[in-house]
Amino acid sequence: MRKINFFDTTLRDGEQSPGVNLNTQEKLAIAKQLERLGADIIEAGFPASSRGDFLAVQEIARTIKNCSVTGLARCVKGDIDAAWEALKDGAQPRIHVFIATSDIHLKHKLKMTREQVIERAVGMVKYAKERFPIVQWSAEDACRTELPFLAEIVEKVIDAGASVINLPDTVGYLAPAEYGNIFKYMKENVPNIHKAKLSAHCHDDLGMAVANSLAAIENGADQIECAVNGIGERAGNAALEEIAVALHTRKDFYQVETGITLNEIKRTSDLVSKLTGMAVPRNKAVVGDNAFAHESGIHQDGFLKEKSTYEIISPELVGVTADALVLGKHSGRHAFKDRLTALGFQFDSEEINKFFTMFKELTEKKKEITDEDLVSLILEEKVTDRKIGYEFLSLQVHYGTSQVPTATLSLKNQENAQLIQEAATGAGSVEAIYNTLERCIDKDVELLDYRIQSNRKGEDAFAQVYVRVLVNGKESAGRGIAQDVLEASAKAYLNAVNRQLVFQSNMSGLKNHTAVGS
C-alpha cells in the first residue's frame, strides 16, 4: 500500500499566523510532540529570516532523531548557506527551496522572465544538492502557473537534483478537481517525474485546503504539507489531523497508509493551541470540543443504542478519553513521574524533583490535579523565555462595589534585574491591572482581544487567559495560566509583551547573522 508522507509546517507556515511568536523552547516542545505524533518531516522555520529562527531550527535539528528536520530557503545562496549551518548537525537534514513560477509573481514581485526563473531554480537546486542529501523544490503559486511552463521547470529541477517537488496552492484558489489535475498533468507530461515525489501544500482561503490535499493524493501526490489545527497565514493551512483521520477512516477509498500515531492527535492539538494562543473552535473536525458531542434527541437515541449510527470515528482513536486520572496530595513521586511519561514528557531526575516540588505546592491549593493541570504547570515553567522582558512577581487588586478598582504590581526587568512597582486604577479590575502594566513597561500597548478559558470544571480550576495586543504597533499574542483569573490576566499581558520583545531582539540580530546572496 502506498505511503503518504506528512510534512508538518506548524513551526514555519503555522507560526506566520498573525500574533503568533513562539520562542525556541516552545518550538522545541512542539517539535518533540510532532516526533511522537509520527510526522515524517518537520519544517522547523526559515533560518535566513532571523537570528531567532536560525537558532530554533538549529536546536530542533540537533534534538529530533526519528524524523527529518527541514528549513525553508529562497533560491538564494545566502539562504541556502544559512539553512545548511542550521541543519547540518541533524540526523536527517534536508532543505526546502522555493521560487515563484506564476506570471503574476514573475512580473510584479520577481521582475524576472521565465528563462531567468528556470536558470535561478536549476542553479540553486544544484547548489543546495552539494550540501543536502535531500532537496525539495517548490513552485510558489503553482496553482496560477501555466501547466506547460510548470512541467518544463519541474523537469529541469529534477534533473538538477530535486527529489521532492511541491506544487502549492499558495492563495487557496483552486477547486479540488482543478488542483488534482495539476498532479495528473505532471505525472503524464514530465518525463523524469518518476525520480521525484510530488508534494501538496494547500491554503484554506476558500475552505478547501483539506479537500484539495486529498484530491492531490488521488492524483499521485506522495507527500502532504499541513499544520496542526490548520493554523497558518490568512485562513490557514490544511489541517494535519483532518487529513490523517480521513485517510485512516476511508482507507477503503484512498488505499494509502501513513505513519501518524492517531492517538497522539488530541495531545498535539492541545499543545499547539496552548503555546500559540490560538483557540480550537468547538465545532472543529476531529479535535474540537463538539467533535464527539450529540445534542439532537434522535441522534442521542441512536447513539445510545449503537455508537456507529452517528459516530464514524471513536474519541479514543485520536486520544480523547473520558477516563481522566487525577493525582492529589497523597500521590507519590513514582506516580507523578509515570503520569508525566504517559503525557509524553521526558525529564532527568533533577527536573523531576523540581516539578514534583511544584506539584506538591499545587496540591495545597487544589484537591485534585488533572492532566490538564500538569501540562499547564510544566509548560508555564519549561517554555518561558526568562532572558528577555519582564518577570511577574506579585499582584494586589483592591475592589469593591463602592470603590475604584486599583491594582498594584511588582515586576522584574530580566535584562538588568531592576525591580519595578507601580499602581493604577481602571473601570474594572482587569483594566486596572493592564493600566498598571502599561506604566511598568513603558510601551504603547493596545488590547485587541481577551479570552478566558478553564482547564476543567470545579471552583479550583486553573484559569487560562489569552490576549492579542499591539506592542508599539506590532501584533503579539500571549497566554497566562493561574488559579486566579486576575493573575492569569496579568501574566497573559506580560507574555504577549515579552514575545514581542524577543521577536524584536531576534530581528535586530538579523543583519549580523546572515548575508543574502544571489
Swiss-Prot record:
What is a biological process (GO) this protein takes part in? L-leucine biosynthetic process
Q: In which pathway does it act?
A: Amino-acid biosynthesis; L-leucine biosynthesis; L-leucine from 3-methyl-2-oxobutanoate: step 1/4
Q: What class of enzyme is it?
A: transferase
Cofactors: Mn(2+)
Q: Which InterPro entries match?
A: 2-IPM_HCS-like (IPR050073), 2-isopropylmalate_synth_dimer (IPR013709), AIPM/Hcit_synth_CS (IPR002034), Aldolase_TIM (IPR013785), LeuA/HCS_post-cat (IPR054691), LeuA_allosteric_dom_sf (IPR036230), LeuA_bact_synth (IPR005671), PYR_CT (IPR000891)
Principal location class: cytoplasm
Q: What GO terms fall under cellular component here?
A: cytoplasm
- Show the catalytic activity: 3-methyl-2-oxobutanoate + acetyl-CoA + H2O = (2S)-2-isopropylmalate + CoA + H(+)
Residues engaged in binding Mn(2+): 13, 201, 203, 237
Q: What is its EC number?
A: 2.3.3.13
**Short name of one Pfam family for this protein?**
HCS_D2
GO molecular function, a single term: manganese ion binding
By its UniProt entry, which PROSITE patterns does this protein fall under? Answer: AIPM_HOMOCIT_SYNTH_1 (PS00815), AIPM_HOMOCIT_SYNTH_2 (PS00816), PYR_CT (PS50991)
Give the keywords, sorted. Amino-acid biosynthesis, Branched-chain amino acid biosynthesis, Cytoplasm, Leucine biosynthesis, Manganese, Metal-binding, Transferase
> Where is the region Regulatory domain?
391-518
- Reported function: Catalyzes the condensation of the acetyl group of acetyl-CoA with 3-methyl-2-oxobutanoate (2-ketoisovalerate) to form 3-carboxy-3-hydroxy-4-methylpentanoate (2-isopropylmalate).
Q: What is this protein called?
A: 2-isopropylmalate synthase
The record lists the organism as: Bacillus subtilis (strain 168)
